A protein has these predicted regions:
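GNAT-family acyltransferases
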Residues: 1-94, 107-148
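Conserved acetyl-CoA pyrophosphate-binding loop and the N-cap/start of the following alpha-helix
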Residues: 96-105
Length: 148
């Protein structure tokens, strides 16, 4: 795909992944703990990276409540080398919800982006059992997946 435009919204049984511009700025601001001006600047910067195909960031909304629960996606994307780093930011969610989101991110990296090498930095908001169940292996502070 020549642009990332078709990569939104993404749906899982319980979550909707969409561009941060599709959410109310106040909701995003509450999660980032920044004022509205700083948040707007940050959202614009993330969208510039998305349009440049160097990153891909979605707001993640709980579908049942329409509540923004965090954001995640990919950074350090190099589509020619088929490498990138995935992340999930926001408050810690229950393990089953973490699993649904992480599985979607890993599958997206493999199937849609065609990555051969994916990293995820260890985080206190993600359970290690969730990461292992998604097929990631821990190497120090970084979790890693590699196509064989």
């Amino acid at each position: 795909m020549s642009s990332f435009e078709g990569y939104h919204p993404l749906l899982t049984p319980n979550f909707r992944f969409d561009w941060l511009t599709q959410f109310r700025l106040k909701q995003v601001s509450q999660l980032t703990h920044q004022d509205l001006a700083e948040t707007a600047e940050w959202v614009n910067a993330t969208m510039r990276h998305t349009m440049a195909r160097t990153a891909l960031t979605w707001g993640i909304e709980r579908r049942a409540t329409h509540k923004l629960v965090g954001w995640g996606g990919f950074e350090r994307l190099n589509l020619q080398q088929k490498t990138g780093r995935t992340y999930l930011t926001g408050p810690k969610l229950p393990a089953n919800e973490q699993q649904e989101i992480v599985n979607r991110l890993v599958h997206f990296a493999q199937e849609e982006l065609g990555l051969d090498d994916l990293e995820l930095e260890a985080s206190t908001n993600l359970d290690t059992a969730v990461l292992a169940a998604a097929g990631l292996l821990q190497r120090g502070d970084v979790w890693h997946w590699q196509r064989h």
